[in-house]
From Swiss-Prot:
Belongs to the short-chain dehydrogenases/reductases (SDR) family. It is an enzyme of class 1 (oxidoreductase). It comes from Aspergillus parasiticus (strain ATCC 56775 / NRRL 5862 / SRRC 143 / SU-1). It holds the Pfam family adh_short. GO terms for cellular component: cytosol. It is found in: Cytoplasm, Cytosol. It comes from the Eukaryota. This is 5'-hydroxyaverantin dehydrogenase. It catalyses: (1'S,5'S)-5'-hydroxyaverantin + NAD(+) = (S)-5'-oxoaverantin + NADH + H(+); (1'S,5'R)-5'-hydroxyaverantin + NAD(+) = (S)-5'-oxoaverantin + NADH + 2 H(+). The lineage of its organism: Eukaryota, Fungi, Dikarya, Ascomycota, Pezizomycotina. 5'-hydroxyaverantin dehydrogenase; part of the gene cluster that mediates the biosynthesis of aflatoxins, a group of polyketide-derived furanocoumarins, and part of the most toxic and carcinogenic compounds among the known mycotoxins. The four major aflatoxins produced by A.parasiticus are aflatoxin B1 (AFB1), aflatoxin B2 (AFB2), aflatoxin G1 (AFG1) and aflatoxin G2 (AFG2). Within the aflatoxin pathway, the 5'-hydroxyaverantin dehydrogenase aflH transforms 5'hydroxyaverantin (HAVN) to 5'-oxoaverantin (OAVN).
């Protein structure tokens, strides 16, 4: 098992531009904070209202940070976010796209939901299932990946603003991209899908001059798992006593390594602090 060298020169990020979907909370916000501190032009695209974005911008005052409301399940909304991110940068080009938007673990195996629908009948149609996990975590990431590979090819109008040609696409999977989960269906389906997208895409993104990597964090105590913690608590289980959470800082370090290390691309199995695995 190869160990990831996280020694990176943050100076290489100075002046670069990034779009982070899901950047208003959790790993996305922590990454935006770190990259802004490194001197990057960071656009946060998130479904949270503009007021939330304005509060984030106030908190990150002094950095080059832009906020745009974005529903990642909407193709048009994502195009708007990409165009705003490009216009925000002096180079009028993007260097890094981080597809971090996601919704929390939705419990219930598909079999549970089928049984809950009752005995099969021909005179009544069953209600459609809740597939928001798949819509946001997989389709949304697919849209971001597609548009990232499309817009990352733009040449900077001002090469002096950022002369580096290195481009990076970072996809957000999870431990659910690798681990069986008989207690749920849509969340692991979405995360296995992101892993499949990564494994099929990484072989060819170099043709477009783009590096592609996958983050697959272990459980992290962020707002994303709040519903899971609540459900476990209702059963008398304290997740904090049963699990050792990975840290947000470790995930940010892994994301920054993917962004800054020009040699890191679609690498065979790497494990980094329960956080990065390909």
């Amino acid at each position: 098992m190869e160990v990831l060298d996280t020694t990176v020169d943050l100076g290489t990020l100075q002046g670069k531009s990034a779009l982070i979907t899901g950047g208003a909370s959790g790993i996305g916000l922590a990454t935006a904070r770190a990259w802004a501190a490194a001197g990057m032009y960071v656009t946060i695209a998130d479904i949270q209202p503009l007021e939330t974005g304005q509060n984030i911008l106030a908190d990150l005052a002094g950095g080059h940070v832009h906020y745009v409301c974005c529903d990642v399940t909407s193709w048009e909304s994502q195009i708007t976010a990409f165009k705003e991110a490009i216009q925000f940068t002096p180079s009028k080009a993007l260097d890094i796209v981080a597809a971090f938007a996601g919704v929390s673990f939705a419990g219930g195996n598909q079999v549970d939901h089928v049984l809950a629908a009752g005995d099969p009948r021909l005179d009544v149609n069953p209600s459609p299932p809740d597939i928001r996990n798949i819509q946001v975590n997989l389709i949304g990431v697919y849209y971001t990946s597609w548009l990232g590979l499309y817009y990352l090819r733009l040449s900077p109008t001002n090469k002096a603003a950022n002369p580096s040609p290195d481009k990076s696409l970072i996809l957000m999977g999870s431990i659910g991209s690798y681990m069986d989960s008989p207690k749920a269906s849509t969340y692991p389906a979405s995360k296995f899908g992101v892993r499949g997208l990564f494994r099929s895409t990484r072989a060819r993104t170099r043709e477009l001059g783009v590096r592609c990597n996958l983050l697959a964090p272990w459980f992290i105590d962020t707002p994303l798992i709040a519903p899971m913690k609540k459900a476990m608590a209702a059963r008398g289980i304290d997740m904090a006593q049963r699990l050792t959470f990975a840290s947000v800082d470790a995930c940010v370090e892994a994301a920054t390594t993917c962004a800054a290390n020009p040699q890191l691309h679609g690498t065979p199995p790497i494990r980094y602090a329960y956080c990065l695995k390909t």
